[in-house]
Amino acid sequence: MKPSSRLRKSALWIAAALSLGAINSGHAAEGPIAAPVELSPAVLPGKGLAQHPFLYAGEWDHRYPDQTMFVVRDGKVAWTYSIKLKDDAGQIQEFSDATLLSNGNIVFARKTGAALVSPEKKILWNYDAPPGFEVHVAQPIGLNRVMLVQNGNPAKMMMVNIATGKTETEFKLPVGNPAGTHGQFRRARMTLAGTLLAAHMDNNKVAEYDMSGNEVWALAVLSPWAAVRLKNGNTLVTSNRGFVKEFSPKGDVVWEFSQQDVPSIKLFNFQEANRLANGNTVISCWCPGALKDPKDWPNSVQVIEVTPQKKLVWALRSWDADANLGPATCIQLLDEPGKPEDGDQQR
């Protein structure tokens, strides 16, 4: 259906923000801040690495020649897997999406493609994006399929059977800038209703599509990084402008969180958000776009957990040698109920 009048009205304030130069299609969604700034207090709420077991990965840790994802259990790094910062063709690789499945394998997107890796670090399935295209979305659909969104001209959604290697469903996705491959999508998710919910970062909207590629619902949001359809029917959206908002099906904001709700900690780009079974929200905060000097990164908080009342109950800052997690993009809590490949977790 066509965008509602609410969508058109919301677009007006987005246009105003654009006129002030608020949008940038690349990683650097915020200007550099003076450093070193007091980014977070010495003592943070929660139990640090021991708060939850979790899978963690981040984009563009350009301090090192390898990019690493981590599994943390009992407050310690239990497993890692690394890829090169640059592939054999010299293209930058980064972890944009990652999910630990119930069988122990991990599906991940790496910008230059996507793959499935076993706990023994054996690649069980791999997809390489064609030159000029990028893959930042890899969602497991059961244990035998992966939904990919491929940035480029054209951008498209693909449902791939990893057992056969065949693409079973695909359709093109509209974008704001066909030539701006890198700034098009970071996150999209299949819903339990069988539709695709896509955060159009360069189109300033979240849109839902049926499997024929028809838009069935849309919402104007400034530079959305991720969008998740919650079990209550609402949609949880993060923006790399530093806010998280929960919208009703009618487009009303029913809950929101931003920097002003936690003034004691400097927050940067909001990327992934998880709505937990207890109602709390976990948010990853990616810092390299604002903190240009990596020496300043260890002062920053990577992940926060807040209650529905916006109380901060966990702030993760882990840059020490034995658990140098790097910038935060993906976090999957491993103590949440259900099977992630069945859509049981809200992330």
Please give the residue ranges for each predicted region.
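Bacterial N-terminal signal peptides
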Residues: 11-22
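Histidine-/acidic-rich catalytic cores in large beta-rich domains
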Residues: 29-347
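N-terminal secretory signal peptides that target proteins for export/translocation
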Residues: 1-7
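Sec/Tat signal peptide C-region and signal peptidase I cleavage site
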Residues: 24-27
